[in-house]
């Protein structure tokens, strides 16, 4: 696989509940039909209280993540305060759209974070289209995961319930999607909060 970009066919989920954003992603990357890495982090910390999930070409996603970090750092240095989640989302949308006709970045992004205006979750596709959502799923397993979210999401979910729902959505996608698997990384972002945890699948979950 030397010289080839690894394609991350995956499932990522984002949920807004109360003052928090919950992001979740499976832990496997693939190249074609081959499992390239059994455990891969697909939730990238961008700023103190902002993170991004990635699906698509890993190399492209890494470039976008570095640009997001640069934008956040530059904003903080110049203005002395953290960038708003919406402002960062708009910047990433512009970047993706600008490269569309030249060499498009093959990525789908969920940008989640907390700022003075509360929790936010933005979906950004490879065309640079941008939308703010209460819940969303991306990646090869997203149809299944989104179905779970649509059926079970409520605005009054507790934080623990939201974490369980995110895990359930990714787990359901894993049962149907051979490109997602191994376990789930979960990140919770809220007021003065950035917490990472990992839940590995039991054999009964990943068994066909």
Swiss-Prot record:
Molecular function per GO: threonine-type endopeptidase activity
Propeptide positions: 1-9
Compartments, record wording: Cytoplasm
Keyword S-adenosyl-L-methionine attached: no
Activity regulation note: The formation of the proteasomal ATPase PAN-20S proteasome complex, via the docking of the C-termini of PAN into the intersubunit pockets in the alpha-rings, triggers opening of the gate for substrate entry. Interconversion between the open-gate and close-gate conformations leads to a dynamic regulation of the 20S proteasome proteolysis activity.
Catalytic center residues: 10 (nucleophile)
EC code: 3.4.25.1
Keywords on record: Autocatalytic cleavage, Cytoplasm, Hydrolase, Protease, Proteasome, Threonine protease, Zymogen
GO biological process: proteasomal protein catabolic process
Major location category of this protein: cytoplasm
Segments crossing the lipid bilayer: none
Reactions it catalyzes: Cleavage of peptide bonds with very broad specificity
Keyword Protease found: yes
Entry GO terms, CC: cytoplasm; proteasome core complex, beta-subunit complex
EC primary class: hydrolase
One Pfam family per UniProt: Proteasome
Quaternary organization: The 20S proteasome core is composed of 14 alpha and 14 beta subunits that assemble into four stacked heptameric rings, resulting in a barrel-shaped structure. The two inner rings, each composed of seven catalytic beta subunits, are sandwiched by two outer rings, each composed of seven alpha subunits. The catalytic chamber with the active sites is on the inside of the barrel. Has a gated structure, the ends of the cylinder being occluded by the N-termini of the alpha-subunits. Is capped at one or both ends by the proteasome regulatory ATPase, PAN.
Protein name: Proteasome subunit beta 2
